[in-house]
Curated annotation (Swiss-Prot):
UniProt key word Repeat: no
Gene assigned in the entry: tolB
Protein name, entry field: Tol-Pal system protein TolB
Organism expressing this protein natively: Allorhizobium ampelinum (strain ATCC BAA-846 / DSM 112012 / S4)
Function description: Part of the Tol-Pal system, which plays a role in outer membrane invagination during cell division and is important for maintaining outer membrane integrity.
Cellular component aspect of the GO annotation: periplasmic space
């Protein structure tokens, strides 16, 4: 199999203090805990540069913030000042007249060693004060990642929450006809750019999941008509089978510390949940029922596990302790529940719900209370959390369409976005923030 090497990136963060330093008081902000909020008008003129790279970087920053649903970029055609020197204080009246509450200015220069230096400043236009100023150094080929890091810094400064733009998605890329569909493992940036294939075989692949350190992916593949769980090293492209069990293995996922893989093993007509220690390769059985127990997901502290089971007749969600004790049903609504995944914040569990011939993506609290459906359609499935626990990605196949596509939606349920990919796509999994 052809190997792929992840781009190594060295980014140096330097605070930009000085004449425009920000006082400790809070300036313009967005409270994302209030539910659906009015997007904040923000102006992002093209970053200064000698070769056009500045405009490319600022465009990605703008696209990231707009897609979050929390920011409304001001139309560039209305700008009085088309570009701004970040070393000079902006004329705030030229921005407040456009109702821009925040202003981002920046500059991209190339150092003598070939690296790019990217610097930006974030301004509160009505207070006339700088809120943030940072600069980064990186290789030219990593310019998109610098843009995502800048967008994360702006998002965090204004909302008080960590951003999620400097992340990747691993997913199943689908091509071909419905009767001759090829499914390959692929990886991309969270905005759908920089897509790369990780596998290139005719074997079916399903349910890829990132490790907490972002360097490994576990997934299921049918090889020799036998489904197995594999561990893929993203740096080297090397892979190995996670255990050699007599029956089917599926729905793999890492523990929060990355030391174990939890999965479902089929025995006769039943399937139960097991964990495997990746160092010793020893397995521990957590459930023992005459039912189908599958799709396990750890709480972020590793103490509890949510999973789906049809032990009550229909697929429902259950929570248990990490040793398998205390198995308790938490879903009681009409229909069936599947593909649960615990939020990185620990406060919610996302799931797929099938009811009335439709599929919904929803969330509930770990005790089963507060169920909310965020989106409903012909076929929605497989939610995955952004690392800040504020956004979900899932896949949807519309009625009559040729194949599935990826979508993102925030916890308000209002900001739903298509994530464009070169081919049909399913089974997304969101990485932690990159470093």
């Amino acid at each position: 199999m052809k190997t792929f090497s992840l781009l190594r990136i060295l980014i140096v963060l330097v605070g930009m203090a000085g004449a425009f330093a920000t006082p400790a008081m809070a300036l313009v902000e967005i409270n994302i805990n209030k539910g659906n909020v009015e997007p904040m008008p923000i102006a992002i003129p093209d970053f200064l540069s000698a070769n056009g790279i500045g405009a490319k970087i600022s465009a990605v920053v703008e696209a990231d913030l707009k897609r979050s649903g929390l920011f409304a970029p001001v139309n560039h055609g209305a700008f009085i000042d088309k570009q701004i020197n970040p070393d000079q204080a902006p004329n705030m009246q030229n921005w407040t007249v456009l109702n821009a509450q925040a202003l981002v200015v920046g500059r991209i220069t190339q150092e003598g060693d070939g690296r790019l230096r990217a610097e930006f400043r974030l301004w509160d236009t009505y207070a006339g004060q700088q809120m943030s100023g940072q600069q980064f150094y990186t290789q030219p080929e990593n310019w998109r990642r610098v843009a995502h890091i800048i967008a994360d810094a702006i998002y965090e400064r204004i909302t008080g929450e960590k951003g999620y733009f400097d992340t990747r998605i691993v997913f199943v890329a689908e091509s071909g006809t419905k009767t001759d569909r090829k499914r390959q493992l692929a990886i991309m940036d969270q905005d759908g750019e920089n897509v790369r294939m990780l596998t290139n075989t005719a074997n079916l692949v399903l349910t890829p999941r990132f490790s907490p350190n972002r360097q490994e992916v576990t997934y299921m593949s049918f090889e020799g008509n036998q489904p197995r769980v594999y561990l893929l090293q993203l740096e080297t492209g090397q892979r190995e089978v996670v255990g050699n069990f007599p029956g089917m293995t599926f729905s793999p996922r890492f523990s929060p510390d990355g030391q174990r893989v939890i999965m479902s093993l089929q025995q006769d007509a039943n399937s139960n949940i097991y964990t495997m220690d990746l160092r010793s390769r020893t397995t521990t059985r957590l459930t023992s029922t005459a039912a189908i127990d599958t799709s396990p997901s750890y709480a972020p502290d590793g103490r509890r596990i949510v999973f789906e089971s049809d032990r009550g007749g229909r697929q429902q969600l259950y929570v248990m302790n990490s040793d398998g004790s205390g198995q308790t049903r938490i879903s009681f609504g009409e229909g069936s529940y599947s593909t649960p995944v615990w939020s990185p914040r620990g406060d919610l569990i996302a799931f797929t719900k099938q009811s009335g011939g439709k599929f919904s993506i929803g969330v509930m609290k770990p005790d089963g209370s507060g169920e909310r459906l965020l989106t409903t359609g012909f076929h929605n499935e497989g939610p995955t959390w952004a690392p800040n626990g504020r956004v979900l990605m899932f896949f949807r196949q519309a009625a009559g369409s040729g194949g599935p596509q990826l979508y993102s939606i925030d916890l308000t349920g209002y900001n739903e976005q298509l994530v464009k990919t070169p081919s049909f796509a399913s089974d997304p999994a969101w990485s932690p923030l990159l470093e």
